[in-house]
């Protein structure tokens, strides 16, 4: 919890991804280390920003080790970074 509000780089294996058109804002979730709801960290991409990616983020980052840069926030006791651009994410390796 000490890193909330800090601009940082977080890296980890993407355990599962999902694009939720049925939720307000059409979010894409990239969950690190463990699948939802046991993830240790989440990258959130809002639907309004998906067109900035050349490929669907939930497919691009699935089964990859990824680093994301941004401000760490807390949502329902889970840490996350909201990614607005592909420049915030780097694929480190395939799992």
PLM region descriptions:
Residues 1-95:
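OB-fold single-stranded nucleic acid-binding module
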């Amino acid at each position: 919890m000490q890193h909330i509000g800090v601009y940082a780089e977080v890296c980890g294996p993407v355990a599962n991804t999902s694009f939720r058109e049925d939720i307000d804002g059409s979010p894409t979730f990239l969950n690190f280390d463990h699948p939802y709801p046991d993830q240790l960290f989440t990258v959130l991409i809002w639907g309004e920003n998906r067109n900035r990616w050349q490929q669907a983020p939930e497919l691009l980052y699935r089964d990859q080790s990824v680093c994301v840069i941004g401000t760490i926030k807390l949502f329902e006791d889970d840490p996350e970074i909201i990614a607005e651009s592909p420049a915030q994410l780097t694929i480190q390796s395939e799992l």
